[in-house]
């Protein structure tokens, strides 16, 4: 600002010049003040506009250069934009872009929410007189109208529809005929396969054959038992023949193992299950034959199978070398049963029921008697080496007698024909008595004998008063009730070498050496009360429990 120098006006010419200059200076100062006032007013209006509207960053858009550099445009200067010469606002200011058409459609209060309807701000430019405000955007236009729209159909996907997919450069382009139906196309591929498909088919067939080979080799559970045979057959023969031979070998091995398991099961379970099977106890007392032959194939037969053999047809030739059934059953069973099994005396109730069971059996046939005679002839060649001096007419067998018969029988039969396994299938006398005792408490009609034509042994007879000795026959005639025993009993001592009696067709028996045999009949007379009381008081006193 120019300094105003006041001086005395004495009328001199210098004084008049100074007054004129002062007036000019005052005018300049007045104009400057007006400019400052206008500038302050604009600043106040601008500040109020900024305080009323705080736009979001997406509104800070830049106008096209043609609009920015027009004379009728009023903007808030920004460091980014180049300010034209006609703009009057200083820098720095906020980066809000606005024009004189703020009240219009550029920043519409309804859409932006910046201004209220009663407080619309009209920004005027300093150079308003130089050009009208027609340079501003047309009312009704928005910023979205200036956005360039991209045409997706033009330039991007206007070509082939498959061009945007990735195509390997090594893959050959095969043209697909759209006129061919999918079924025809599939048939074309199957009828004319490519080398890759042929190789895959061969590989699949090979793998399937390998899987079948492995599966069939492990089908038989017993293939590991005879592995050396199966492997040698597979090595020698082809694959298909190996399967057949292996299956045949497995069948044979399975048959042998089943046969062996049946023998072992019968040997282990016959004595255990005989307690609950009353019918087995009568097969011995009724004179049925028990399987105890010296040949090896008799081991696989049970007691019931022997009964069936001897009920319908005579015994085969290898079984003729059998001793008396009762003697053999008692002597064999003594090898594995202890004396403790024969302690308690059973009641007379089971004797009556047992006799009624025995009476229902029929007498033997002539054919069976002849076979029995042949067996007794063969039995005569085996002397009783365990013979000891006869004791008194005591019906109770002593402990020494039974033990001697045990040792003799086990040594004789164990070393001669090895039927130790079959001995376990014959129940002991203690178990027989126990079973008879358990059956005696049931009604007679509960379980009749299975075989009507039961074979009655002619040698299972003898009075209750026959003197007992250490021989095998002493056990058989020691007072156990027999089905065809008569009421009369002779008490005559035995000879040194006792022999089984030979029975004839008419029922008469040839007496053994120095032993008077009682008369036998095929009809079974009922027991008298005297014989029953003798048995109960004498021999059955030390019965089994």
Curated annotation (Swiss-Prot):
The lineage of its organism: Eukaryota, Metazoa, Chordata, Craniata, Vertebrata. Its main location: cytoplasm. Residues 503-522 have a biased composition (Polar residues). It is found in: Cytoplasm, Cytoskeleton. Residues 268-342, 461-526 are annotated as: Disordered. Belongs to the SLAIN motif-containing family. Microtubule plus-end tracking protein that might be involved in the regulation of cytoplasmic microtubule dynamics, microtubule organization and microtubule elongation. It holds the Pfam family SLAIN. Keywords: Coiled coil, Cytoplasm, Cytoskeleton. Residues 14-53 form a coiled coil. PANTHER family: NASCENT POLYPEPTIDE-ASSOCIATED COMPLEX SUBUNIT ALPHA, MUSCLE-SPECIFIC FORM, SLAIN MOTIF-CONTAINING PROTEIN 1. Residues 268-286, 466-481 have a biased composition (Low complexity). It comes from the Eukaryota. One of its GO terms (cellular component) is cytoplasm. This is SLAIN motif-containing protein 1. The keyword Cytoplasm applies.
């Amino acid at each position: 600002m120019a300094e105003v120098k006041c001086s005395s006006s004495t009328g001199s010419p210098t004084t008049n010049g100074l007054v004129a200059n002062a007036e000019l200076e005052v005018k300049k100062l007045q104009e400057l003040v007006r400019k400052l006032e206008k500038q302050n007013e604009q600043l106040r209006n601008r500040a109020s506009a900024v305080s009323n509207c705080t736009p979001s960053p997406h509104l800070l858009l830049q106008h096209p250069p043609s609009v920015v550099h027009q004379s009728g445009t009023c903007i808030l200067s920004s460091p980014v934009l180049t300010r034209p010469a006609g703009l009057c606002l200083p820098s720095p200011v906020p980066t809000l872009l606005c024009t004189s058409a703020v009240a219009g459609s550029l920043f519409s209060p309804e859409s932006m929410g910046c201004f209220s309807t009663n407080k619309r701000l009209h920004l005027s430019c300093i150079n308003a007189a130089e050009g009208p405000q027609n340079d501003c955007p047309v009312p009704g236009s928005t910023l979205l109208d200036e956005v360039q729209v991209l045409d997706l159909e033009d330039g991007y996907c206007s070509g082939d529809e498959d061009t945007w997919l990735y195509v390997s450069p090594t893959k050959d382009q095969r043209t697909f005929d759209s006129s061919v139906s999918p079924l025809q196309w599939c048939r074309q591929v199957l009828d004319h396969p490519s080398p890759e498909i042929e190789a895959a088919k061969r590989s699949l067939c090979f793998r399937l054959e390998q899987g079948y080979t492995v599966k069939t080799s492990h089908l038989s559970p017993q293939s590991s038992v005879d592995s050396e045979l199966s492997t040698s057959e597979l090595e020698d023969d082809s694959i298909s023949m190996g399967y057949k031979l292996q299956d045949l070998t497995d069948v044979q091995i399975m048959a042998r193992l089943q046969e062996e398991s049946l023998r072992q099961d019968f040997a282990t379970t016959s004595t255990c299950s005989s307690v609950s099977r009353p019918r087995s106890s009568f097969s011995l007392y009724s004179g049925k034959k028990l399987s105890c032959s010296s040949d090896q194939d008799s081991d696989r037969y049970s007691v019931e199978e022997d009964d069936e053999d001897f009920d319908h047809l005579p015994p085969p030739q290898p079984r003729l070398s059998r001793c008396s059934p009762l003697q053999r059953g008692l002597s064999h069973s003594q090898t594995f049963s202890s004396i403790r099994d024969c302690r308690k005396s059973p009641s007379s109730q089971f004797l009556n029921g047992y006799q009624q069971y025995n009476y229902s059996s029929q007498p033997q046939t002539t054919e069976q008697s002849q076979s029995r005679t042949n067996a007794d002839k063969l039995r005569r060649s085996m002397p009783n080496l365990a013979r000891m001096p006869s004791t008194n007419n005591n019906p109770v067998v002593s402990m020494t007698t039974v033990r001697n018969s045990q040792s003799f029988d086990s040594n004789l039969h164990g070393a001669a024909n090895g039927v130790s396994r079959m001995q376990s299938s014959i129940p002991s006398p203690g178990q027989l008595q126990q079973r008879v005792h358990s059956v005696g408490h049931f009604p007679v009609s509960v379980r009749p004998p299975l075989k009507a034509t039961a074979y009655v042994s002619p040698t299972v007879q003898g009075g209750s008063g026959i003197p007992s000795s250490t021989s095998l026959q002493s056990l058989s005639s020691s007072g156990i009730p027999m089905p065809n025993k008569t009421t009369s009993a002779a008490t005559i001592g035995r000879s040194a070498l006792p022999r089984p009696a030979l029975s004839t067709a008419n029922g008469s028996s040839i007496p053994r050496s120095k032993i008077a045999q009682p008369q036998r009949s095929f009809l079974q007379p009922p027991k008298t009360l005297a014989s029953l009381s003798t048995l109960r008081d004498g021999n059955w006193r030390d019965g089994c429990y």
